[in-house]
């Protein structure tokens, strides 16, 4: 059986004790952790689903990290073992993968905070800090919150190129040494090469710089240079969500600074194109214009700054005349189709312009007592519809341009390609 972990305890236990066998393969989807809503006797310390076989164990991310596969298997972080229900049908254990076993398949319900076994229909539960499965009982021991252990990519991959060129006017950029996927690999400067996957990165919404080599491999601070407290090498490491040493920002001087050491920025030591190895470092720039510490994100995306902003939620209408106004306007605008008009903003099969007219012409019914609340909701929905209409128009215009370009045959396409120097 396996246990949950009190993150205040300490000791070392391997995930690979008392494990069974049989095998095939299943590709992991993403790393995650599961925290129990059960508080325990102290009512303070949170508990996590852990691979440890003892209650007193180290609070390390590796034994709290699991890999969810597309088909519902929950792997250990090493990828060698999966969660299964024991032969007795009660306790949960770690075994090797058997794709034909339904008791190794789980469904994570993030809405209701449940983890259900598909073999017997029972739910992940806690029995004296041991992990088991049991029929649904409504207890906190069956409630789990899950969260990602890996960054969520934004989709915009590119190079971090130095603004300084070598003597032959070649660009150089951040590179994982030998394209290694191993943790604690040095990050160095290499000449930028097309499709060199070890040079391709992206900055995630939480400030990590993610390598294209692996979905869980990020830029991190490496060892100190000669014991210095202001000069460090850079390397790669496993993603840690709240580790400021792994989080970065870009300032107005095109410097990449570290969130833990905000006065230190990424630069390099050596002569580009001359020295056999040019190490990337985290150090103090000599000035705001120190070109060894200035970077170009290539390619750049005009929407990067917009889509990386924290989304501003719509005003929530949950009760009273605000909710009544929202539901009335939704029904009126959609001719009774829905009382939640926001659910249709992304639909391409409805006329948002028609909805806008209906909302604009609506008058406050007698069932709604606050005309002020009604007016506020009405103006808010009109603004939201205006935004949605304009965003859709941008993509419609692009689609129209794209279609007309190809409808003219190859001539326009060839001329355009020549114009932007791709042929």
Curated annotation (Swiss-Prot):
- Annotated membrane topology: Peripheral membrane protein
Kindly list the biological process annotations in GO that this record carries.
Answer: response to cation stress
* Localization annotation: Cytoplasm; Membrane
Region feature Disordered, mapped onto this chain? 1-27
Q: For this UniProt record, give its keywords in alphabetical order, as a comma-separated list.
A: Cytoplasm, Lectin, Membrane, Repeat
Induction, per UniProt: Induced by high levels of extracellular Ca(2+).
Positions of the Ricin B-type lectin domain:
27-147, 118-251
The protein's role, per its UniProt record = May play an important role in stabilizing and/or regulating the cell membrane during Ca(2+) stress or certain stages of development.
Q: What is this protein called?
A: Calcium up-regulated protein A
